[in-house]
Amino acid sequence: GNEEGLRDVAKESMNIGSVYRSYLQDLYRFFKLHPRKAQFDDPFKRDQLFTRYTVLESMLKTPAYLREMASFLMKREYYQDAIAYMEEALKHETADAETLQKVAFCYQHTDRPSKAIYYYQQADLLSPDNEWILKQMYLCYSALGRYEQELDCLKSLEEMNPGDTRLISEIGLCLMQLERYEEAAQRFYELEYKGERVVPSWRAIAWCNFKMGRLEQADKYYRKILQQDKVTWEDYLNAGHTAWCLKQTTEAIAHYRNYLQLYRSKRKDATQPLLSPFDEDRKELLLHGLNDLDISLMRDILQPEPES
């Protein structure tokens, strides 16, 4: 009899919790979705952490409820509101890896990667070698331009997934950001050998060799790229730089004119001067032995007629 009574009490308690949740969720849907919602004062537009309201505090200030409400908000991509619930839950219970991951994920999706990293690092301590956490951390480090830390995360992931071509590519790109072009090129040679992501790898190999002053090797790869179907204006521009630095001026001009033709149709901002990408690379050209007079003369040759 006592056992049945305890079961009934537990069942009733669970039912009360379900009623609370259902009631609040129905309220939320009403104030957010009802056709006449504009006629009512929406309490959800104010402080979303209901536990700060005295009348609701005793009912709602439980970690289980706070976590559940946070998950409800996360699914609907109300990340800032979800953060408030999860951080409140963390005040009342020992942090676990899952909750920390969720807080970090919400910060990541509200464009606060530094705060996201703070929580991902805590989650990583509780759940070491978690691939999902490492992946999110490297994305946050990349967004912050913290490429050394991004590289550490990527290499940890690579140890767990040897031979993963996507990771090889990401590591190569990260090494390029760090201006470690020799190491980066080796990563892309590996992809070329595997027959994976071939044309993007050629682009990276060509640019790494250009940056290292290995112009003949860069030229070899740009020639291969320009024989492909989907050539970009960047391909023509970089091939032009390489040819010009090799003193193949006629060929360089031909590549530059192809770049201008493609860039005219592909640029996102029609007011952007057609030669602005060329001008942005002035420093690279100077480093490879050209001078300001050379560059000014080339600009005069390439200068397109004013657009109507």
Regions found by a protein language model. Give the residues of each.
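Alpha-solenoid helical-repeat scaffolds
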Residues: 1-127
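Conserved structural position within tetratricopeptide repeats
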Residues: 88-91, 121-125, 155-159, 189-193, ...
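TPR/TPR-like (Sel1-like) alpha-helical repeat modules
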Residues: 241-267, 295
